[in-house]
């Protein structure tokens, strides 16, 4: 990588409640813990990492649009419940054409029927689900490897 790579981690609705919300489904790790670990891993690889969480679809869309202006090279996104409902998130991700990985803490395919469909997965570079918080670390490793090609 000639310039320092820039990776944005986007967290959707209710992920600010990690650690306390349904820990049997999502684990006990907090969002702050996840972001801290990712920051350490990114720093060790000389990668710029920024994070953003919102419970509001429009704010997520605005941040993704800004990512294009900011020159972000890769996005890691856990869209939360918007995975199953948001054509608008799909459209903005397709529109900015920044490669991205979709991450889910739980295995969405083992859950309720309505959670089994993702509006994003067919345009994502990859999907990681069901591995808990380590899924974010794997997504970061994959993003860095892709950017180093």
Curated annotation (Swiss-Prot):
Domain of life: Bacteria
CDD domains membership: DHQase_II (cd00466)
Task performed by this protein: Catalyzes a trans-dehydration via an enolate intermediate.
Top-level taxonomy: Bacteria, Pseudomonadati, Pseudomonadota, Betaproteobacteria, Burkholderiales
One Pfam family hit: DHquinase_II
UniProt similarity note: Belongs to the type-II 3-dehydroquinase family.
Entry EC number(s): 4.2.1.10
Protein name: 3-dehydroquinate dehydratase
Active site: 26 (proton acceptor), 104 (proton donor)
SUPFAM superfamilies assigned: Type II 3-dehydroquinate dehydratase
UniProt pathway annotation: Metabolic intermediate biosynthesis; chorismate biosynthesis; chorismate from D-erythrose 4-phosphate and phosphoenolpyruvate: step 3/7
Enzyme class of the recorded protein, top EC level: lyase
This protein's UniProt keywords: Amino-acid biosynthesis, Aromatic amino acid biosynthesis, Lyase
Gene: aroQ
The keyword Lyase is assigned to this record: yes
Self-association state and partner proteins as the record states: Homododecamer.
Naturally occurring in which organism (per UniProt): Polynucleobacter asymbioticus (strain DSM 18221 / CIP 109841 / QLW-P1DMWA-1) (Polynucleobacter necessarius subsp. asymbioticus)
Positions marked as site (Transition state stabilizer): 21
GO biological process: amino acid biosynthetic process; aromatic amino acid family biosynthetic process; chorismate biosynthetic process; quinate catabolic process
GO molecular function annotation: 3-dehydroquinate dehydratase activity
Annotated catalysed reactions: 3-dehydroquinate = 3-dehydroshikimate + H2O
Chain sites annotated for binding substrate: 78, 84, 91, 105-106, 115
PROSITE patterns listed in its UniProt record: DEHYDROQUINASE_II
């Amino acid at each position: 990588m000639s310039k320092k790579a820039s990776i944005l981690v986007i967290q959707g609705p209710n992920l600010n409640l990690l650690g306390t919300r349904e820990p049997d489904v999502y684990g006990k790790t907090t969002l702050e813990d996840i972001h801290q670990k990712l920051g350490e891993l990114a720093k060790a690889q000389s990668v710029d990492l920024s994070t953003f969480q919102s419970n509001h679809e429009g704010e997520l869309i605005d941040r993704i649009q800004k990512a294009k202006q900011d020159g972000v090279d890769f996005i890691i996104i856990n869209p939360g419940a918007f995975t199953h409902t948001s054509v608008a998130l799909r459209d903005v991700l397709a529109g900015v054409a920044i490669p991205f990985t979709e991450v889910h803490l739980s295995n969405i395919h083992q859950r309720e029927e309505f959670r089994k469909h993702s509006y994003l997965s067919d345009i994502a570079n990859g999907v990681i689900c069901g591995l808990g918080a380590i899924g974010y670390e794997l997504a970061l490793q994959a993003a860095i490897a892709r950017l180093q090609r």
